[in-house]
C-alpha cells in the first residue's frame, strides 16, 4: 500500500507529539510491538501478535493537526491494512480496544462487535500501586 510503512525508532518523536497533541498518555516504547505501521504520516497503530489465534489491534493514534477528512481516509486505510495483516498471518480472532467513538464506529464497519458488559483488566508489574489480593 502506498504511503504505508513499518514504524521505526525515528518515528517515535513524531508519534509522541501526536499523543501529547491529543492530551493522551504516551505509551512506554517497550510496550509497543515491532509490528506498528504508519500511514501518510497521519495515523499509526500496532498489532500485538500472540501465540494463539488471537491478535490485538492497539495504540491507534493520529496527527491532531491533520485535515480531518484526510485523517479519516488514512485511518480507514490503516485499520483495513491491520485487519488484513492479521488475517494473512493466520489469526482468526482480532481484538481492538478503544474509547474513541470514531474508532468504535470504524471497527463496527469492519464487522467488530462490542462487549458492553465487560471491563478491561490490566496489571502493570512496574506500577508502585497497591496490588491487593482479596
Identify the residue ranges that each predicted region occupies.
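Short amphipathic alpha-helix that is part of the acyltransferase structural core
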Residues: 1-27, 118, 128-134
Amino acid at each position: 500500500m502506498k504511503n504505508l510503512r513499518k514504524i521505526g525508532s525515528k518515528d517515535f518523536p513524531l508519534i509522541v507529539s501526536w499523543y501529547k497533541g491529543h492530551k493522551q498518555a504516551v505509551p512506554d516504547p517497550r510496550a509497543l510491538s515491532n509490528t506498528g505501521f504508519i500511514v501518510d504520516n497521519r495515523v499509526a497503530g500496532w498489532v500485538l501478535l500472540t501465540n494463539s489465534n488471537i491478535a490485538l489491534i492497539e495504540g491507534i493514534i493520529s496527527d491532531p493537526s491533520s485535515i480531518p477528512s484526510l485523517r479519516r481516509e488514512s485511518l480507514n486505510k490503516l485499520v483495513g491494512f491491520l485487519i488484513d495483516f492479521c488475517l494473512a498471518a493466520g489469526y482468526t480472532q482480532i481484538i481492538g480496544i478503544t474509547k474513541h467513538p470514531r474508532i468504535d464506529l470504524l471497527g463496527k464497519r469492519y464487522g467488530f462487535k462490542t462487549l458492553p458488559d465487560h471491563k478491561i483488566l490490566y496489571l502493570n508489574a512496574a506500577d508502585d500501586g497497591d496490588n491487593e489480593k482479596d
